[in-house]
Regions:
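Conserved alpha/beta-hydrolase
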Residues: 6-26
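The conserved SAM/SAH-binding core of class I Rossmann-like methyltransferase domains
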Residues: 17-19, 88, 163
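Alpha/beta-hydrolase active-site loop signature
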Residues: 21-25, 92, 169
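Primarily recognizes the serine-hydrolase "nucleophile elbow" in alpha/beta-hydrolase
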Residues: 38-101
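The feature captures the conserved acid-bearing segment of alpha/beta-hydrolase catalytic domains
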Residues: 78-79, 84-95, 110-147
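C-terminal catalytic histidine-bearing segment of alpha/beta-hydrolase fold enzymes
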Residues: 133, 144-147, 154-202
Length: 202
């Protein structure tokens, strides 16, 4: 769905790359994280630009995972490849899925669920920025998870914050991305410009 918002970011002078990935159950959750890591490596090799990773729902999980990735273990990219991420209605602790029908797709157990949950990973470095946006009308679990990961990461020195968007739910929050004048688009565009400027200064 995020590809429909590309023009709003282009209006702010921000280039957009929309990355697809293989879905569960064809592959596992961490296989998808690996796909996205390879995609960002390819983008770096092509553009030499630092991306701001934006994702919704499962994509929010991936945004957090890519920010928290230890890029020093990936050959051919800078160790600070991802300096900022903006997760919208993200899932940062996948353990609650174990008791739902969704686990028929993701096929996790207690150990693999914890290993796939960014909230339990070592936090990103202190100079990284992470925003978790969540709808005010979403379930308490989505709100709890956004508050939890930003609390854990900010406690570790990461510039992390939770933004609750009043009057929106898990789906209508995406309307913010369709408005070039929204606070969400402006924030993401600002992060993109800051990352680009910091890369030029290195």
């Amino acid at each position: 769905m995020l590809f429909r918002s590309a023009r709003e970011f282009v209006a702010h002078g921000v280039a957009v790359a929309v990355v697809g990935y293989t879905l569960c159950p064809e592959v596992g959750v961490m296989d998808i994280v690996g796909e996205l890591r390879r995609a960002l490596k390819s983008l770096w090799e092509t553009t030499k630009q630092t991306p701001v990773v934006v994702g919704h729902s499962a994509g929010g999980h991936l945004a957090a995972a890519l920010l928290a990735t230890d890029w020093s273990t990936v050959a051919g990219v800078p160790t600070d490849l991802v300096r900022a991420a903006y997760a919208i209605s993200g899932v940062f602790d996948v353990a609650p899925l174990l008791s739902t029908s969704l686990n028929d797709l993701v096929k996790l157990d207690a150990a693999t669920a914890k290993a796939a949950s960014p909230v339990y990973w070592p936090p990103p470095p202190k100079d990284r920025t992470f925003v978790a946006a969540v709808g005010g009308d979403e379930s308490q679990e989505f709100i709890r998870q956004s508050l939890e990961i930003t609390g854990v990461w900010s406690g570790a020195g990461v510039k992390a914050e939770c933004v609750v968007v009043p009057g929106t739910n898990h789906f209508t929050i995406l309307d913010e991305l369709a408005n070039a004048d929204s606070a969400m688009v402006a924030r993401v565009a600002g992060l993109a410009r800051a990352c680009a400027a910091s890369r030029k200064g290195t």
